[in-house]
């Protein structure tokens, strides 16, 4: 996305290896986690609104008998807009201001939240809540691992990003093949890849904190982009887990 995105963090100096005890780092990471948590709250509220308020729901979804029967052209715009925004930001935002980074974060979170109304219409509320709890638990454990491990995870970054590209290609292929086996493999790999990205991005944020040298503006930007990375990882893990734990509406 910019200098704060994947690949910008260099190796950690040996004298900074024990970063888990740094109070400044803990404060920085807490800011990231708080932003992710608030983003999930906003997304949940928007998902509920777009699935439960008829005037809003009908702008995005075609519902028959209380079940999702299709989507509208506006939904397609909302669903793909976050990807477009991230691509534009990746090429255009080299030294963004904190306000710009914050606006980008909340815009993407809002768009994704609105599109998640489809999840509320497709799966039962109980299964969505249970899967969210499983995702939150897994996210906490994986991020804690990335935060505390002394193993350098940098080498996994390229592998994981190649995996994401592979998932996108496989998902497009599955639309035409309609193979249950391929879909199952995609869902399994999706869980594994985004689990790895949660740990990887957490450690990457630690590296970034030390590279910024305490600059407040840089940390504000990094907080927004770091939260965005972890938020997207969470949402993707949640959706892949729903393929296993989600109960379809009757």
Swiss-Prot record:
Organism (species): Caulobacter vibrioides (strain ATCC 19089 / CIP 103742 / CB 15)
Organism superkingdom: Bacteria
Record keywords, A-Z: Cell membrane, Membrane, Transmembrane, Transmembrane helix
Spans through the membrane: 36-56, 73-93, 101-121, 128-148, 156-176, 180-200, 225-245
Subcellular location(s) of the protein: Cell membrane
Any one Pfam family match given in the protein's UniProt record, by short name: Bax1-I
Principal subcellular localization: membrane
UniProt-recorded name of the protein: Uncharacterized protein CC_3663
